[in-house]
């Protein structure tokens, strides 16, 4: 069966040929301390660092992370690896502005408090109960557990910078919104 888009007001059902080949590559979060953020995203959520880029003249670093198989062929050449990183799908970019990690009261706005803006990232997992147990074992803070609230079988955790991360098991969501 081929893909058929849902029809809603404002939806262009036939994307222009000029957009063929466009790929959603990454979304970016600003982080206070890259060591803490990288530990969370690699150890707790299983992402791998694809590339780090430093910009000393502007005093910031970019870390690009994604889920990749261990046997994935990654270019050794720095330029080729950068180009490869920007060709991937589902990448998370963490931006660290140098010095923020030493400011005790420094905090980024997560977008969920007023004024609202950015909401959350979402990770799908094969077993929601096992994921919840994993997060509990590692003392990851929950915003919402799967059995709380009106929307069941959906969890929200927080990363070290307070950003919300939705955790879902796709098979449990078949009746969502029905």
Regions found by a protein language model. Give the residues of each.
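Vicinal oxygen chelate
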Residues: 2-24, 48-123, 132-158, 170-178
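Short glycine-/small-residue motifs
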Residues: 167
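Basic side chains
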Residues: 30-32, 51-52
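Short, contiguous, helix-prone interaction/anchoring segments in small proteins
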Residues: 25-30, 36-39, 45
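Conserved active-site tyrosine of GNAT-family acetyltransferases
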Residues: 37-42, 65, 135, 162
